[in-house]
Amino acid sequence: MINASLKELSLALAAKKVSSVELSSLFLDRIERLNPTLNAFVTVDREKSLQMARDADARIAAGTAGPLTGIPIAQKDIFCAEGWLSTCGSKMLANFVSPYDATVIRKMHAEAGLVSLGKTNMDEFAMGSSNETSFFGSVRNPWDTQRVPGGSSGGSAAAVAARLAPAATGTDTGGSIRQPAALCNLTGLKPTYGVVSRYGMIAFASSLDQGGPMAASAEDCALLLNTMVGFDERDSTSLERPVEDYARDLDKPLDGLRIGLPKEFFGEGCDAEVMAAVRAAIAEYEKLGATCVEISLPNSHLSVPAYYVIAPAEASSNLSRFDGVRYGYRAPEYGNLDDMYMKTRAQGFGAEVKRRILIGAYVLSHGYYDAYYLQAQRIRRLIANDFVEAFKHCDVIMSPTSPSTAFKLGEKAADPVQMYLSDIYTIAVNLAGLPGMSIPCGFVGGLPVGLQLIGNYFAENRLLNVAHRYQQATDWHQRRPGGIE
């Protein structure tokens, strides 16, 4: 049961071969045993989870269950969940118990009947590429516990890779689902911006943030995505579109598929062995009936600098609400209101968050707004236009997800620029608002390599189909880390 797919678990629950309580207990026991090594979860509430499992069993017995009712999953601790600690990996919210459910949580609990096993560790306020900025300590990669799992959804990635949960939620602002998926041998999907509600998802950069699924396979991601999507009037950026069944087209053949290979993503800057694994995966696609065309994304080299103006600018605004007045951490000693603000924020935020708040405040300040922020927004439009032009010549774009395999804990902690370049292939997708995936495509030195798939707007079905057909022809996604038991 530990390695079963969501579809297999669904069939087992429906056939009464196992109960949700038994299944949830199995994973909760595994979390209790292995989480001290991995630090993937920051909050586990066994009784809450088992009560949800009992409710799910009642729905199954009554014949009112959905496809995933009773299946336990992990929730990234960026989603508010009523009655649960919702920390966002920060001292600022270390004791914050949410009074309400995020829309994604409500849809999963109340509508789909999924069971939450707990809240997973993450980079503080989702700011990081290695899960080393969390107030609750670094997460360790199950493939090598001396290495990072990627970030910011590193806790979710480590939890699923080590089978502490069969699937998990993540969020992606510049690569935070795809990069950990690549480093932990998972399938991760960032949907088109606006497809998944951001209500109750603690904001980092509101024009970039998007929630999505992380699991072993494309099929599992499709099933989980079905429970997450839908218009939400409480999110002003939510898109009102017909709800799709993302598992519908998984088995379609790939004959005639046109794969775009951006020349800018296949030059220097990527580890040679990682690139070899990516090229081998593309060759496998050609065997499945696809053809490759060279395309250009001429402004993609500007994506990292543009992102590190826009995202910190939005973060400096979003994080101004954390001031110690109504909720969250408050400095124990202060002289007056201004002193309370300063001490609370100085003590409550970690170094990387403070760095990005300072950058954001600077680029939005009088005299620098036009030179930095407006210029970054112009570049963002050019990057989006490049993708529009590219998709006239191809159906899906492929590239490495990350320029390297998982690096050692602490290796890049003192060099923010090197850390930021970990997301060099993923950031442009967020700036354009496109859907993107990472799927396992090989190993280098025993560490996983991810292949990035980028689709046109609302092409999640096509991406999942392309990923699924590759996973039917290969077994990379079925490999599990050893040595963590």
Swiss-Prot record:
The active site is at K76, S152, S176. It catalyses: L-glutamyl-tRNA(Gln) + L-glutamine + ATP + H2O = L-glutaminyl-tRNA(Gln) + L-glutamate + ADP + phosphate + H(+). Its EC number is 6.3.5.7. SUPFAM superfamilies: Amidase signature (AS) enzymes. The keyword Transmembrane helix does not apply. Keywords: ATP-binding, Ligase, Nucleotide-binding, Protein biosynthesis. It is an enzyme of class 6 (ligase). One of its GO terms (cellular component) is glutamyl-tRNA(Gln) amidotransferase complex. GO terms for biological process: translation. GO terms for molecular function: ATP binding; glutaminyl-tRNA synthase (glutamine-hydrolyzing) activity. InterPro entries: Amidase, Amidase_CS, Amidase_dom, AS_sf, GatA. It comes from the Bacteria. Gene3D superfamilies: Amidase signature (AS) domain (3.90.1300.10). It holds the Pfam family Amidase. Heterotrimer of A, B and C subunits. Belongs to the amidase family. GatA subfamily. Allows the formation of correctly charged Gln-tRNA(Gln) through the transamidation of misacylated Glu-tRNA(Gln) in organisms which lack glutaminyl-tRNA synthetase. The reaction takes place in the presence of glutamine and ATP through an activated gamma-phospho-Glu-tRNA(Gln). This is Glutamyl-tRNA(Gln) amidotransferase subunit A. It comes from Dechloromonas aromatica (strain RCB). The lineage of its organism: Bacteria, Pseudomonadati, Pseudomonadota, Betaproteobacteria, Rhodocyclales. The gene is gatA.
